[in-house]
């Protein structure tokens, strides 16, 4: 289910006055939930110098992943490990970036399917995102970007206007001219089972630190807080939750990267939005051991976050060298 990459789905309308049916968004009880943001991609550098067990994920698999799978999560043992991790966390909401879209399997030659999720794949099979979260969830992805998706547990609510288990373009967004195709910032409204609604924004900022990359990210931050392309900010509901991979570190890079500084224009204790995830130079890095680029932001929800291997009491969930990001798990409440 989808629409063209610049069209606005009527079923996901958010009024330009900044309130997505504001009267209906006041919940009958304070909202509490567990949310996860996870960039499930990889890069060739992750396995450099690592001992690779026989039959494991090594340089040959990494080359195929890069050439055919967009370096997204498509290696079945890792899918299994990640699904087990999420089952243990038992989240209400998950947002993914760089997750392989199984609908691309027909484009992949047979000899590059062996050992990956496309081996034995058939149309109608669950997507990787659906496999990770399991039964009881709806999954929806960005307009023009099926590698960026959100999943909501039906016990929390359902995506507005999405009646299926999978709505391929269920998150509305627009392309930023000159910054690639498809929506890297996208919005969906969740109709809460307890009453009211929550506006969810999934962010995957453009990567790189050349001037054009930074400029793209500035414009993407503006999509979140100024205008998504339909006259309203992405975060334009009565209550908003913004999650994802910013591809910059506002706590470390604001003096160097204008896109990091732009986040601080809108997010802080003296701003309309606040950081739920920790920021700052003393925060243990969750990306490649060097930075914190995966974040959670809200205007009404507060809470605490943790990440495997960097937060005390939370060990690794896989022994396979693949991910350069760690998942961020946040317990939130109003």
Regions found by a protein language model. Give the residues of each.
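C-terminal motif of bacterial Sec signal peptides marking the signal peptidase cleavage site
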Residues: 1-2
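N-terminal, active-site-proximal structural segment of metallo-dependent hydrolase catalytic domains
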Residues: 6-19, 23-131, 198, 218-221
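Extracellular/periplasmic catalytic domains that process cell-envelope and extracellular macromolecules
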Residues: 28-30, 86-88, 131-134, 143-144, ...
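Active-site beta-strand/loop signature of hydrolases that rely on acidic residues for catalysis
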Residues: 34-40, 78-113, 151, 188, ...
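Surface-exposed intrinsically disordered loops and tails
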Residues: 48-74, 102-130, 158-179, 211, ...
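Surface-exposed patches in mature extracellular/periplasmic domains of secreted proteins
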Residues: 93-98, 136-144, 236-237, 277-279
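Metal-dependent phosphoester-hydrolase catalytic domains
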Residues: 228-241, 248-334
């Amino acid at each position: 289910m989808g629409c063209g990459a610049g069209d606005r789905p009527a079923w996901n309308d958010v009024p330009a006055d900044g309130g997505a049916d504001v009267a209906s968004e006041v919940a009958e009880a304070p909202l509490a939930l567990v949310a996860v943001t996870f960039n499930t991609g990889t890069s060739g550098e992750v396995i450099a110098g690592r001992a690779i067990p026989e039959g494991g994920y090594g340089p040959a698999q990494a080359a195929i992943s890069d050439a055919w799978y967009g370096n997204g999560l498509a290696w079945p043992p890792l899918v299994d490990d990640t699904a087990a991790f999420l089952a243990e966390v038992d989240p209400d909401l998950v947002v993914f970036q760089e997750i392989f879209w199984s609908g691309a399997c027909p484009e992949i030659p047979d000899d590059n399917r062996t050992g990956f999720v496309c081996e034995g794949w058939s149309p109608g099979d669950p997507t990787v995102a659906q496999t990770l979260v399991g039964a009881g969830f709806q999954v929806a992805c960005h307009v023009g970007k099926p590698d960026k998706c959100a999943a909501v547990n039906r016990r929390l609510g359902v995506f507005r206007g999405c009646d299926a288990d999978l709505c391929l373009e269920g998150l509305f967004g627009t392309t930023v001219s000159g910054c690639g195709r498809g929506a890297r910032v996208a919005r969906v409204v969740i109709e809460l089972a307890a009453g009211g609604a929550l506006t969810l924004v999934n962010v995957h900022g453009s990567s790189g630190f050349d001037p054009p990359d930074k400029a793209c990210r500035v414009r993407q931050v503006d999509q979140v807080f100024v205008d998504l392309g339909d006259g309203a900010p992405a975060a334009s509901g009565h209550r908003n939750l913004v999650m994802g991979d910013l591809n910059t570190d506002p706590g470390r890079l604001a003096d160097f990267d204008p896109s990091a500084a732009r986040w601080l224009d809108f997010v802080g204790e003296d701003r309309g939005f606040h950081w739920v995830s920790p920021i700052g130079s003393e925060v243990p890095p969750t990306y490649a051991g060097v930075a914190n680029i995966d974040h959670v932001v809200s205007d009404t929800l507060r809470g605490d976050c943790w990440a495997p291997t960097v937060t005390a009491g939370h060990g690794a969930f896989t022994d396979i060298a693949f991910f350069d990001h760690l998942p961020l798990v946040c317990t939130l409440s109003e």
